[in-house]
């Protein structure tokens, strides 16, 4: 293992139990899947987050669930990245995406926040948008006048939850490809 090959994978969400199973916590749920699959316990506390570290296919990996609430996610991610000297392009963010149908993945190497306040916070705290992200489709509001906060903080219907969990293996494979330096391949194989 190359000692400089370290990655931070952060799943975004809100920390209280009442938010479990909500659209906005899709990143937390995906990180829980990776934690279980990779055998990395996310139970230590540091920099306003729950974290753990391990090795995945030769890569040193730090998994993080910021406990700052969604809109302040950068307040946990940036100090954690700084502590481990992880450059922004080795920070992979998992988050919800209301512009994609449930279960659709959208992998990007960088880009704007696209209206996502968690990403906005991370961009501000890291000082740029040059970090990869895997956005998890949670579905759009049912109608334009539907309150956005009510929508993202609402629970998934069973069929939407299944559409998302059915993509966890693809999300894991995409994260592995990104860590292997094959982000473009991850996009072509798993976007959509």
Go through each PLM region and give its residues.
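Hydrophobic alpha-helical segments within soluble ligand-binding/sensing domains
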Residues: 114-118
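Nucleotide and nucleotide-moiety/phosphate-recognizing core
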Residues: 1-110, 120-134, 141-147, 154, ...
């Amino acid at each position: 293992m190359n000692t400089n090959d370290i990655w931070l994978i952060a799943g975004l969400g809100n920390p209280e139990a009442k938010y479990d199973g909500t659209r906005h916590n899709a990143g937390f749920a995906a990180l829980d899947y990776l934690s279980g699959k990779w055998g990395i316990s996310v139970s230590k506390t540091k920099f306003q987050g729950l974290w753990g570290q391990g090795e995945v296919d030769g890569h040193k990996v730090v998994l993080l669930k910021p406990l700052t609430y969604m809109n302040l996610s950068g307040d946990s991610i940036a100090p954690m990245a700084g502590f481990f000297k992880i450059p922004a392009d080795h920070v992979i963010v998992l988050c919800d995406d209301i512009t994609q149908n449930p279960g659709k993945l959208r992998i990007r190497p960088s880009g704007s926040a696209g209206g996502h306040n968690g990403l906005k916070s991370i961009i501000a705290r890291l000082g740029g948008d040059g970090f990869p992200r895997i956005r998890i489709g949670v579905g759009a509001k049912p109608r334009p006048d539907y309150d956005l906060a009510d929508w993202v903080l609402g629970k998934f219907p069973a069929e939407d939850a299944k559409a998302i969990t059915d993509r966890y293996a693809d999300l894991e494979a995409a994260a592995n490809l990104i860590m292997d330096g094959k982000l473009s391949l991850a996009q072509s194989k798993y976007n959509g």
